[in-house]
Amino acid sequence: MTELETKENKKQIYNFNKLQKRLRRNVGNAIADFNMIEDGDKVMVCLSGGKDSYTLLDILLNLRHNAPVHFDIVAVNLDQKQPGFPEHILPEYLSSIGVEYKIVEENTYGIVKEKIPEGKTTCSLCSRLRRGILYRTATELGATKIALGHHRDDMLETLFLNMFYGGKLKSMPPKLVSDDGKQIVIRPLAYCKEKDIEKYAVAKQFPIIPCNLCGSQPNLQRQVIKEMLQTWDRRYPGRIETMFSAIQNITPSHLCDPNLFDFKNIKRGQLPKGVEGDIAFDKEELPQTPIIDEDTEDFVNNGQLIRFKEVN
């Protein structure tokens, strides 16, 4: 190996380590900010075979070695009996990394196909069926937390989906309790960018399994929102970061929901807690979010160069 090749190899290793540290830091911060994992927890990581859930499992396993609390991990995959689903991939992968796992076999694919007319969106029914099965499995395994692989971009997409199509100011919470009060669901990737997860999944060479059930629905409303946000991100760098910051800084007195703020009892001469005066827009110019050029990064995996360059 020449001196130039050695230098390039070191740079690529450095870039991968930087990416991994960034993901670990973001996951660690989310866990701490929302008290997602506590001492003695058994965390059930829902593994679909996609880039997000693989990354979630990998980072949690990595963090567990240095975490200030002890927690166990069990990976769970729901085999929905989709035609052509490669049943061997996840058991082989999970066995190779030595993690406890369970494969749950339920023919939700057949139910969805039976109930949903051809050409209609299957996501709503599919997600409800999956949720019920995963909650039941968590109880059977004695899991105290259910970890899902939704990331920052998913949360913003959900925000706009609810605004545009549902008339609600609502996103995905980083932590929630199930309707029956028996399960706690956490999203440790809440602070992670999808671009970082994509790069990490390729660099780690996870055996990705595509979802053929919903992948054949190109006109999904979520896909429309995703493309809109991606366009904004390319044209206006920093906008996504600013929007995510917005859902962490809510001012109920400047919205229109009387359930969140007592507008009826506002009196002259009073400045109740939570009121920020008569300024609707805080500044003429939004504060600039520092933008780090993370779009071009080269990694080495098993001696092979993996190059990432985002195309605008």
Swiss-Prot record:
Kinase as a keyword? no
The free-text cofactor remark is:
Binds 1 [4Fe-4S] cluster per subunit. The cluster is chelated by three Cys residues, the fourth Fe has a free coordination site that may bind a sulfur atom transferred from the persulfide of IscS.
* Domain of life, source organism: Bacteria
What Gene3D superfamilies would the database entry show? Answer: HUPs (3.40.50.620)
Example of a GO biological process term: tRNA thio-modification
What Enzyme Commission number(s) apply to this enzyme?
A: 2.8.1.-
- Among the Pfam families in the record, one is ATP_bind_3
The listed location of motif PP-loop motif is 48-53
Which InterPro entries has this protein been placed in?
Rossmann-like_a/b/a_fold, TilS/TtcA_N, tRNA_Cyd_32_2_STrfase, tRNA_thiolation_TtcA_Ctu1
Give me the reactions it catalyses.
Answer: cytidine(32) in tRNA + S-sulfanyl-L-cysteinyl-[cysteine desulfurase] + AH2 + ATP = 2-thiocytidine(32) in tRNA + L-cysteinyl-[cysteine desulfurase] + A + AMP + diphosphate + H(+)
Q: How does it assemble?
A: Homodimer.
Which miscellaneous remark does the UniProt record hold?
A: The thiolation reaction likely consists of two steps: a first activation step by ATP to form an adenylated intermediate of the target base of tRNA, and a second nucleophilic substitution step of the sulfur (S) atom supplied by the hydrosulfide attached to the Fe-S cluster.
Q: What is this protein called?
A: tRNA-cytidine(32) 2-sulfurtransferase
> Species name for this entry?
Mannheimia succiniciproducens (strain KCTC 0769BP / MBEL55E)
What is this organism's lineage? Bacteria, Pseudomonadati, Pseudomonadota, Gammaproteobacteria, Pasteurellales
